């Protein structure tokens, strides 16, 4: 490889590295490794509200931060489509036991008050026979409870 070709390859590599933060931030809708974080704020009525959309093996946002001992309302919907999805967070030790058996395009609201700081996974529990689970395909996220 001559010097000019090496320079072109190096330049292209540098371009990819520099543009990755702009174009490669990732969207959980298209990149299962992308993280979209939302920090809930407490409304005037003292409730933390977050809207989550589920779809083609993603949740958006897929990282939600809430405060302990403050009521939470999650409004969970599904993008239009044929594939069934659900939503589950199981952490009874922290006051969290959420299960929406079938997501819909109309919002379904779940209410709970987390009592213990920690990171708790939320997942789609659906799995077709002989296929990866929806969780394994990227339909998972984290509910982080802070003090």
Q: Would you name each region that the model predicts?
A:
Residues 51-53, 73-75, 88, 123, ...:
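Soluble periplasmic/extracytoplasmic beta-strand elements of cell-envelope proteins
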């Amino acid at each position: 490889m001559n010097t000019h070709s090496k320079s072109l390859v190096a330049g292209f590599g540098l371009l990819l590295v520099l543009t990755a933060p702009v174009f490669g931030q990732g969207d959980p809708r298209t990149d299962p490794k992308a993280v979209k974080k939302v920090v809930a704020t407490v409304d005037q009525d003292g409730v933390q509200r977050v809207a989550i959309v589920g779809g083609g093996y993603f949740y958006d946002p897929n990282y939600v931060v809430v405060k302990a001992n403050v009521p939470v309302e999650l409004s969970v919907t599904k993008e239009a489509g044929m594939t069934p999805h659900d939503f589950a967070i199981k952490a009874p030790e922290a006051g969290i036991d959420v299960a929406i058996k079938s997501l819909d395009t109309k919002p379904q609201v779940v209410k709970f008050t987390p009592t213990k700081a920690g990171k708790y996974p939320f997942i789609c529990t659906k799995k077709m026979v002989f296929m990866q689970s929806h969780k394994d395909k990227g339909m998972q996220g984290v509910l982080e409870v802070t003090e």
